[in-house]
């Protein structure tokens, strides 16, 4: 079975780069990759490390289809070379251990083919009921995160959960890796309740 869809190449490349920021090396292959799902004229790219989920949505045309990239980093490099309409041809043949999933990406005179994984193997994001919400200017939020992010360090399994995070509390945004503390104060940007997240997820 072959399904076909098309998206804007630059929009797809940008979305892929953005969600890929949350990816980590994992013993579970799909957690190191990006899920692509096209349905109802919309292409949704999803990436997760289980703790953090990133989604990007862009317009799409064609058949409904879904798959998980293999070697997302290599796919992202290829996508940066595309410009214009990007055609996605997804092939799903065979069954069981003989099942073969391939993705052909065509744009202008260029074409690349990658192996893919089944979308049903990707974890499902459980519904989240927000305890609080607030609206901020994205550029202002990014600036604050960049000011303190140097003290967040790189998240690693051997570290405490807070070491790779930026934390929000009221007018304060801060980061602490055990040896360094960075804090920024801005009364015009208030978090209604304390929370923390990976700095890389916000950059």
What does each model-identified segment do?
Residues 1-203:
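Structural preference for solvent-exposed beta-strand-turn elements
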